[in-house]
Curated annotation (Swiss-Prot):
EC number: 4.6.1.17
Protein name, as recorded: Cyclic pyranopterin monophosphate synthase
Keywords for the protein's UniProt record, in alphabetical order: Lyase, Molybdenum cofactor biosynthesis
Keyword Methyltransferase appears in the UniProt entry: no
InterPro entries on file: MoaC, MoaC_bact/euk, MoaC_sf, MoCo_biosynth_MoaA/MoaC, Mopterin_CF_biosynth-C_dom
Quaternary state and interactors: Homohexamer; trimer of dimers.
Gene Ontology MF, one: cyclic pyranopterin monophosphate synthase activity
Catalytic residues (UniProt): 128
GO biological process, one term: Mo-molybdopterin cofactor biosynthetic process
Family to which this protein belongs: Belongs to the MoaC family.
Length: 161
């Protein structure tokens, strides 16, 4: 098992020094789900929400969240992201919305936390916009789907998970 990089020998949390690392293209994808009643999903898909376009708002929120991850998660580095993409898809057969985020940069540290934050905040935004209609929506699971670049190598979720 790998060592925790954010904990020093004394057991104290610290920000990892990435100054000696090589700049490489880094990419990460994450997903999140929001499960709801079929009527709530239909309202979103049909564009009948009185607050406006739920998907467009969630997309912008996810992009903003990726760019501000370093302000939310204490030991994350501020990153110069070159791409953030948020895809939202209604899955009526499961009464849910699937959110997939993609973050990319050329840099010295990965973008996994940015991708996870983007997907999570997009899901939270859907909940926020629809909570007046349904309070018992469920957010989750949220997970990393894939990452590439960097010293630790590539990762991809098993297709059967």
């Amino acid at each position: 098992m790998s060592q925790l990089t954010h904990i020093n020998a004394a057991g104290e949390a610290h920000m990892v020094d990435v100054s000696a690392k090589a700049e490489t293209v880094r990419e990460a994808r994450a997903e999140a789900f929001v499960t709801m009643r079929s009527e709530t999903l239909a309202m979103i898909v049909d564009g009948k929400h009185h607050k406006g376009d739920v998907f467009a708002t969630a997309r912008i929120a996810g992009i903003q969240a990726a760019k501000r991850t370093w302000e939310l998660i204490p030991l994350c580095h501020p990153l110069l992201l070159s791409k953030v993409e948020i895809q939202l898809q209604a899955e009526p057969e499961y009464n849910r919305v699937r959110i997939e985020s993609l973050c990319r940069l050329t840099g010295k540290t990965g973008v996994e936390m940015e991708a996870l934050t983007a997907a999570s905040v997009a899901a939270l935004t859907i909940y926020d916009m629809c909570k007046a209609v349904q309070k018992d929506m469920v957010i989750g699971p949220v997970r990393l789907l894939a990452k590439s670049g960097g010293k630790s190598g590539d990762f991809k979720v098993d297709a059967h998970d």
